[in-house]
């Protein structure tokens, strides 16, 4: 599969192992950075954009109450801006699931 492909996948990210040992007052900001790093690794683009709903989901229990695992939908899309440095960007949004247990990475078919 080429990097040029536009694709959407759902991942479960374990934030607990990424935030272990982090100061309580830095957990939510560190979670945002780790999600961006995760999206960069899996989508191969340095331009990562977070949905405002994801930011609300991270901060919903305060700065130190970040959830242990989150289900994310990461989309690699084309950048239509004229003076863009990269042709593609990653867009990360939360997926509401009752439990993250047993969920695998899934490719989501877009209707676009």
Curated annotation (Swiss-Prot):
Output the PANTHER family linked to this UniProt entry: 60S RIBOSOMAL PROTEIN L31 (PTHR10956:SF0)
Key word Ribosomal protein present in the record? yes
Tell me where in or outside the cell this protein is found: Cytoplasm
Any one GO MF term held by the record is: structural constituent of ribosome
Q: What is this protein called?
A: Large ribosomal subunit protein eL31
> What does the UniProt keyword field contain?
Cytoplasm, Ribonucleoprotein, Ribosomal protein
Main function: Component of the ribosome, a large ribonucleoprotein complex responsible for the synthesis of proteins in the cell. The small ribosomal subunit (SSU) binds messenger RNAs (mRNAs) and translates the encoded message by selecting cognate aminoacyl-transfer RNA (tRNA) molecules. The large subunit (LSU) contains the ribosomal catalytic site termed the peptidyl transferase center (PTC), which catalyzes the formation of peptide bonds, thereby polymerizing the amino acids delivered by tRNAs into a polypeptide chain.
Q: How does it assemble?
A: Component of the large ribosomal subunit. Mature ribosomes consist of a small (40S) and a large (60S) subunit. The 40S subunit contains about 32 different proteins and 1 molecule of RNA (18S). The 60S subunit contains 45 different proteins and 3 molecules of RNA (25S, 5.8S and 5S).
State any GO BP term from the record. cytoplasmic translation
- GO terms for CC? cytosolic large ribosomal subunit; preribosome
Q: Which Pfam families match?
A: Ribosomal_L31e
Family assignment? Belongs to the eukaryotic ribosomal protein eL31 family.
């Amino acid at each position: 599969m080429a990097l040029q492909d536009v694709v959407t996948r759902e991942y479960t990210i374990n934030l607990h192992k990424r935030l272990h040992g982090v100061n309580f007052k830095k957990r939510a900001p560190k979670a945002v950075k780790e999600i961006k790093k995760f999206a960069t690794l899996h989508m191969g683009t340095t331009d990562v954009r977070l949905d405002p709903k994801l930011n609300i989901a991270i901060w919903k229990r305060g700065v130190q109450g970040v959830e242990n695992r989150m289900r994310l939908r990461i989309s690699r899309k084309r950048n239509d801006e004229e003076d863009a440095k990269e042709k593609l960007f990653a867009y990360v949004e939360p997926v509401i699931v009752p439990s993250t247990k047993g969920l695998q990475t899934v490719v989501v078919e877009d209707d676009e």
